[in-house]
Amino acid sequence: MSDQAAAPRTAPPAADADSWRRIRRMVNEHRQALVVAAAQLYDGMPRVAGTDLLCWPEWQPAGPVDLADVTLGWSSRAPVPGADAAGPAAAHVLPASPAGGRFTSYTAAVAALDRPALFENRICYRLLSATLTGPARLTFTRSRYFDAVNLGHAVAHELAAAWAGSGGGPVSLAGLPLRAQLGDPCELRRRCAVTAVTTLTLRRAPGGRASFLLHWRDPARVHHAGGQYQVMPAGIFQPVTAAPAARRRDLSLWQCMTREFSEELLGGPEEYPTRGGMLDYGQWPFYRELTAARQAGTLRVSCVGLGVDPLTLATDILTVAVFDAAVFDRLFRGLVTRNAEGRVVTENGSAAIPFTAEAVHRFAGGREPTQTAGAALLRLAWQHRGPLLG
């Protein structure tokens, strides 16, 4: 990394609500430039597919790993994060509270001053360790969504304020005390690394040509990466309910993916019929159809990597789902144009964007505002298009 950790300093006076919201808007409006500025702080770290998505070498397999070969482990003992957004190091990113003093957390400030439509502190899975280069294994424990947001979005806010103060020039860790205490963003046990399962959906036509889906995330509706393109579906890895039994039963990337396919592509609700807090997947027709397609080989699902966004610390498990065209057309004949988080991108009246070198360069080469993980996933899928589409 480019600088040593910053020494503690006295916090400036608390920002007023308008000034604080202005920096938050800057994070969305200048996200790509801020991602680049954040990535430059970690110039010695590996990147995913030449993008700004940070990784460790063991997170990048040589080729696609069948989802069935990824083992998920569970730890009931979660280490206390060494870095969080509590205490004096975070005071400078917390605005003044109407009740006096500062807000006590970043999410409390968001809820009161800049709440998006979707902003809930749900039970989530926190990633503790990962390897995808040998026997693939991901180990999780219990956490909550705000545990990740409080740090990730606070360090993004801190960097945006410093970047604005420099006139859009380089920033250094010496002026970023909250980020400086973090250390290596890929050291998962030092923070609450709540993960997203981010999926590139490919429709494979006879002959091998493919197309993909793209989502535009509405900044009025989502807290993370509003105003950007993203592959779809993508969603936080979490159980369907907070019931203790559901937490263990839903520790499944596939179950999470099927829910996201339903919600993002078909506009399905996030609330599911449950008994005892658990969803009976075997009684859900859509789940049965998707699972049958996997078993028949007309849907192939692979994990191709894992990475960390340098700006917000968002941590994404990168997957690819390749559907035979006939299966895709049958399962998603009700493909929506809009959903709870934004809209499905269309070109020339079609949601099917050709999976070509030109399209990958457009959406993963800096020409369009694409979320960092989505850009990395597009590039990885293009690199691995032979085994993925063969």
Task: Identify the residue ranges that each predicted region occupies.
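Acidic, glycine-rich loop-and-strand cores that form catalytic or ligand-binding grooves
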Residues: 269-296, 317
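Conserved Nudix-box catalytic region and its N-terminal flanking loop in Nudix hydrolases
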Residues: 200, 207-281
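Alpha-helical and coiled-coil interaction segments, frequently adjacent to or embedded
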Residues: 2-228, 363-390
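NUDIX/MutT-family hydrolases
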Residues: 314-319, 325, 329-383
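Generic structural signal for residues positioned in beta-strands
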Residues: 198, 230, 318-320
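Intrinsic-disorder/low-complexity loop/linker signature
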Residues: 133, 175, 208, 297, ...
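Active-site-adjacent beta-strand/loop module that shapes the phosphate/pyrophosphate-binding cleft
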Residues: 289-329
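Short, solvent-exposed coil/turn linker segments
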Residues: 142-145, 235-239, 252, 347-363
